Amino acid sequence: PKADPRELPFGIGLAIFSRTPLRDRTRRDLPSPPIEFIFDGRRTTPTDRLLIGARTTVGGRDIQLFNTHLLAFFMLGASSEEHRGQRDLLATELGASRLPTLLTGDFNVSRHGSLVAQLARSGFSTVQERAVTWRRRPYVLDHIFYNAPLRPVWHAVEPTLASDHHALVADFEFAVAAGGV
């Protein structure tokens, strides 16, 4: 995200990694509402978040990739159901995609069913919504959302020492369209 003096000391970073070349990179700021909270003895408000994107080609077919890390409203005594701005911007971006699309990230929604339902209205499913992905509380915070041109063939939640979140990994194939095309 853009530089902000309010950023907490651990920072937030996003990346998209691919075995195939990335192109048409995008970034979209996801504004955070001015919810006040106390951190390290001082009153502050949350920093904005980010949605990054890129396109790549796999097997001769273009794919749109997105990654995000949304605000953890539940840690501020609020919820993304009350403050829907970041989620609504994601849903709009996904709804505009005309390509096979993957959206990955830490969505920080403690009651993730409402997020899954919202993105389903934009034509997206998540590869899983049962296995806990965060070590600190039994929440499913991390997701891989995909649209109908793609079909998941395998997924797993793998413990890792690299993060306080477990790694969510998945393999996809292109779904065969009606008429075998």
Language-model features, listed with the residues they occupy:
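Active-site-proximal beta-strand/loop segments in catalytic clefts of secreted hydrolases
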Residues: 2-3, 19-20, 30, 68-71, ...
